Amino acid sequence: KVLVFFVATILVAWQCHAYDMFPLRMNTGYGARTPEVKCASWRLAVEAHNIFGFETIPEECVEATKEYIHGEQYRSDSKTVNQQAYFYARDLEVHPKDTFVFSIDGTVLSNIPYYKKHGYGVEKFNSTLYDEWVNKGNAPALPETLKNYNKLVSLGFKIIFLSGRTLDKQAVTEANLKKAGYHTWEKLILKDPQDPSTPNAVSYKTAAREKLIRQGYNIVGIIGDQWSDLLGGHRGESRTFKLPNPCTTFSSSFTSQQSSLLPIYLYVIRCVQIGALASLYVVSAVCQQVM
């Protein structure tokens, strides 16, 4: 009995300390920068949501960002993600309400022309200037997303655009989508800035997806360039596909404190699970001794 209890105790301690050895997120945390990290590695960590909540890209990474965007890699990365979405969709049996949900800015419409004029992400995001650019309605299509969109339409999927753009931009957004080559969609959902129930992007998009599901839509795929496009609940039976965003990644619904605590929550849950398992071993040993 003593031996079983000792082994169980070691098991719990080992599992609980495993968090220290295998953290779920980089210990640099919320928006932190490690100077010795190369720009390509920094970008990868951002895309993987290990670095988040930053206001600008590092100044020393501007040239690397330009090379990434204007070279072959950015389009190649976009192509790979869109291809995987298509390969997944191609193997599905399509039903009338099966739907793919797309974000707009940075996903179907490129905002690279804006960032090209504003430091490729090294300048702090200015919503007023960005809105002025959006209202011109000249955003080009992201070519690989447009190809995927056309393929999904031909397969029979409903297309829903779910954007953080506000309702007052509906007309310019519809015109820009058509100008860029997106000629048909089921719904265009824009944000009501007066709605207090959705204070951030994740809660807004979660609520929008919940409404779609209540309306009978079956969300089978979500494609976006921001983690806020993909996080949250009510994603139906979907797979999510994260497109690269080389210039900026907006903060998700997690605050810095919540984000840093998330791995600890999982860590505590794991310890409780292992502790319960160890307790069962002890009880079993005691019962055997009694019998």
Curated annotation (Swiss-Prot):
It comes from the Eukaryota. It comes from Glycine max (Soybean). The keyword Signal applies. Keywords: Glycoprotein, Seed storage protein, Signal, Storage protein. Accumulates in the stems of developing soybean seedlings. May function as somatic storage protein during early seedling development. This is Stem 31 kDa glycoprotein. CDD domains: HAD_VSP. Coiled coil: none annotated. One of its GO terms (molecular function) is nutrient reservoir activity. Glycans are attached at N126.
